[in-house]
């Protein structure tokens, strides 16, 4: 049965895996992999794992930058979709997206698990919206202004790749992230990794609770 299959959680680095597993404990229906940084590595490593056995679905979990006034440091973001804004071509008239070129799409769809997000919202501010997957993290005012126009709530680097891998196996995909810093001019003195990793641990705890209920992940999502 579908609800007996494991769910794959993909994180980019070992520190995220450790925080997530602290919250999950021993959970037989969940598997966690480190898929690497950037959406190329994330796509390849997630697809490699998905090829080994059947899964119920895939969730990309990690830290992210939040756009000011949309997702504050310490909050959680849930993707309604993922956009990779750099895929396309330059021209004298401006950027041309891969969609406009006719070679693919810069957008991947994501599901929001209502039971999981509902439980998380009891103890966290949870924001829903577009999460960007970028090749180069924003670090200047110029880049911030360009990306802010896209209306996203957060910026990360792996969601597009993990989503593409899940799609190739016809599996549902979600992306959940905790906000460690504001998107904008790079200033590590204002980042809060401990709070973000604490949030990842709490996401793990909540996933464990959901899986132990009669309800299971991906049985109630949109």
Q: Model-found features: residue ranges?
A:
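Glycine-rich phosphate- or other oxyanion-binding loops that anchor nucleotides, phosphorylated ligands
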Residues: 18, 22-222
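Short polar catalytic/cofactor-binding loops
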Residues: 12-16
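Extreme N-terminal starter segment of soluble prokaryotic enzymes
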Residues: 2-8, 30
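Basic/polar N-terminal segments that are highly enriched at the extreme N-terminus
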Residues: 1-2, 222
């Amino acid at each position: 049965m579908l609800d007996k299959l494991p769910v794959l959680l993909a994180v980019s680095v070992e520190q995220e895996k450790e925080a997530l597993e602290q919250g999950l404990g021993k959970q037989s229906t969940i598997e966690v992999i480190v898929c690497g940084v950037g959406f190329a590595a994330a796509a390849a490593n997630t697809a490699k794992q998905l090829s080994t056995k059947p899964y119920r679905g895939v969730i990309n979990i990690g830290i992210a930058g939040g756009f000011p006034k949309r997702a504050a440091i310490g909050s959680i973001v849930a993707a309604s979709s993922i956009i990779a804004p750099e895929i396309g071509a330059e021209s004298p008239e401006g950027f041309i997206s891969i969609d406009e070129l006719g070679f693919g799409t810069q957008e991947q769809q994501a599901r929001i698990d209502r039971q999981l997000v509902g439980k998380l919202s009891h103890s966290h501010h949870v924001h829903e919206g577009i999460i960007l997957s970028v090749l180069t993290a924003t670090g200047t005012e110029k880049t911030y202004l360009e990306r802010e126009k896209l209306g996203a709530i957060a910026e990360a680097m792996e969601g597009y790749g993990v989503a593409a891998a899940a799609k190739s196996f016809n599996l549902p995909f979600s992306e959940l992230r905790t906000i460690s810093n504001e998107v904008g001019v790079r200033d590590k003195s204002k980042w809060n990794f401990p709070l973000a990793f604490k949030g990842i641990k709490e996401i793990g705890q909540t996933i464990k609770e959901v899986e132990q209920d009669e309800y299971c992940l991906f049985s109630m999502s949109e």
